[in-house]
Amino acid sequence: MDQNCTPLHDLCIAAGGRMVSFAGWEMPVQFSGLMAEHKAVRSDSGMFDISHMGVLRIEGANPKDALQQLVPSDLHRIGPGQACYSVLLNEQGGIIDDLIIYDLGPSLLDESHETLLVVINAACAETDTAWIRQHLERADLQVLDEKKDGVLLALQGPKAIGLLERLSGSDLSELPRFGHCSLNIHGLQAPVFTARTGYTGEDGVELLLKADDGRQLWQLLLEEGVTPCGLGARDTLRLEAAMHLYGQDMDAATTPFEAGLGWLVHLEMPALFIGRQALEQAAEQGPSKRLVGLKLQGRSIARHDYPVIHNGATVGVVTSGSWSPTLQEPIALASLPPALAKLGTELSVEIRGQLQPATVVKRPFYRRS
């Protein structure tokens, strides 16, 4: 089957990227090596081609009120220049996908209209887009594919902001986490949508720009010594930060309460949204499972769907697992009954027929100082 390629595909290969198939795209899994890339983001700066992600522009009359029908988070908490993380839900309160919603403020063409930018996961982009269009598109509201021939680039790490300030001549000290702005970067033709967001547990930005500018910025960042990073390091970085991966740590059969995302559910707001009734019942009854952090003894790595054992019985499953390059030990996220989700609970994970001791620990495993 033919794979989609991002506008940075050839540049990734030229930079040493080892390409793999991911969610219908040919993407770099690593460049210099997972460990080196992971360390670069934790100590300096790294960049990721994330142009496979879906990007939608919702523009028209009262887009927040319209999108509010689909998410449990109060969208009126954010204003122009701000963003929030949330989830799309089905009628059962299960998670269809997670997403970031950016408020771009009044439309440039019609000040009576407003604009939202929505970033969705690559694997869910087609179904998410159809779902959102089904419920939102009307005469005075459009849902547009914003990413066509565009580049989405993540620049992450403790030195990322300083580098971007130097390349743009701008002071970003007042740009808060989940804030966004339009930035002029030296040598690029058009202003760059710049959001202080990321999927690594480090400070940094995600940049949306036209293909030609994206290619130029990639080369510029390489010349500045920024480490190109692949999907492998992106996964170990997000796992250390206990950030969810859709399809592993949550899915359409998992509610936000079961995924440890109850803080996204604002039942105190009056707005009706798909799945609200199911979540009201779930909030009253309490979740039947919880997402927890595990640290394992030894060096064996727990992978997705490995059984979690307690007193000889299977009590849950690992949702994500890896070796932690920062902590130098195996870590995992797992779904367990609430009674076993308490910190310090000792369990085992079955790895290739052997039981490996594990302990429930606090999430995230890593938090930047």
Swiss-Prot record:
Keywords, sorted A to Z: Aminotransferase, Transferase
Record-level GO cellular component terms: cytosol; glycine cleavage complex
Keyword Signal found: no
InterPro entries noted in UniProt: GCS_T, GCS_T_bac, GCST_C, GCV_T_N, GcvT/YgfZ/DmdA, GcvT/YgfZ_C, TrmE/GcvT_dom1
Name of the top EC class for this enzyme: transferase
One BP annotation, GO: glycine decarboxylation via glycine cleavage system
Coiled-coil intervals: none
One family name in Pfam for this protein: GCV_T_C
Single GO molecular function: transaminase activity
Catalytic activity field: N(6)-[(R)-S(8)-aminomethyldihydrolipoyl]-L-lysyl-[protein] + (6S)-5,6,7,8-tetrahydrofolate = N(6)-[(R)-dihydrolipoyl]-L-lysyl-[protein] + (6R)-5,10-methylene-5,6,7,8-tetrahydrofolate + NH4(+)
Recorded superkingdom: Bacteria
EC number(s) recorded for this UniProt protein: 2.1.2.10
Family label: Belongs to the GcvT family.
Subunit structure: The glycine cleavage system is composed of four proteins: P, T, L and H.
Role according to the record: The glycine cleavage system catalyzes the degradation of glycine.
UniProt name for this protein: Aminomethyltransferase
Record organism: Synechococcus sp. (strain CC9311)
Gene (name only): gcvT
